[in-house]
């Protein structure tokens, strides 16, 4: 019995997103970058407005890793995946719990949207967008 290509693609995307989140928690830069396109584009919560290219994306994590090292958390929830034959997107929520030592009680939940494209038969992240609601 053949598996539905859409469900196979969805399972691959979910696995890729979960492995990315695990890599973030482990501060494993090579695993974080493993499925990103060299010319990827990112919109993040902190400035700048956009990051173009894998090296700019790599550099952005240097601001976040110290926060994790102090006990911050990074957990995905409400993951939803939509796939086509060669493009897909995923959206989820990222709960960022404050480090215990920060004294802050207001954890942050941000929105995540990731755009994927099939490149040489592999799902590749071409766009990543993190945002929070404007007040």
Model segments located where?
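A beta-strand edge to alpha-helix "cap/lid" segment located at domain peripheries
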Residues: 2-34, 41-135
